[in-house]
């Protein structure tokens, strides 16, 4: 069987991350929210905190792996998208916010450990 396309692998990684986060009590507010500045993979609510979750998948650990792929430029794009989300959804604008990263590495996700880095960066 041929390897899954990168978009299929990324979708599977997001599905796995969403399932894990829901199991930890987070509630989904939006998925793949798009704007001119970029995309937010998952927007979730953890108690009263709005959580912007970037899901990163890498097949191999080269070049820093999944976690290493969140550079300063990516952080700025996520921050911009989060601000636009809050402007478009004012009911969440007065809530505390944080940026989390869920990283998955390797082939296949079922049963694979994931890394959930809460408060991965400050904005």
Swiss-Prot record:
InterPro entries: Restrct_endonuc-II-like (IPR011335), tRNA_endonuc-like_dom_sf (IPR011856), UPF0102_YraN-like (IPR003509). This is UPF0102 protein PSEEN4497. One of its GO terms (molecular function) is nucleic acid binding. It comes from the Bacteria. Gene3D superfamilies: 3.40.1350.10. Transmembrane segments: none annotated. Belongs to the UPF0102 family.
């Amino acid at each position: 069987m041929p390897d899954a396309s990168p978009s299929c692998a990324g979708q599977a990684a997001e599905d796995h991350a969403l399932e894990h986060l829901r199991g930890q009590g987070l509630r989904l507010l939006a998925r793949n929210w798009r704007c001119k500045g970029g995309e937010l993979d998952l927007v979730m609510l953890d108690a009263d905190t709005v959580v912007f979750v970037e899901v990163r998948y890498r097949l191999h650990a080269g070049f820093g792996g999944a976690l290493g792929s969140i550079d300063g430029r990516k952080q700025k794009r996520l921050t911009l998208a989060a601000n636009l989300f809050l402007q478009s959804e004012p009911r969440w604008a007065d809530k505390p916010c944080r940026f989390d990263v869920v990283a998955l590495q390797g082939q296949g996700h079922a049963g694979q450990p994931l890394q959930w880095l809460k408060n991965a960066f400050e904005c």
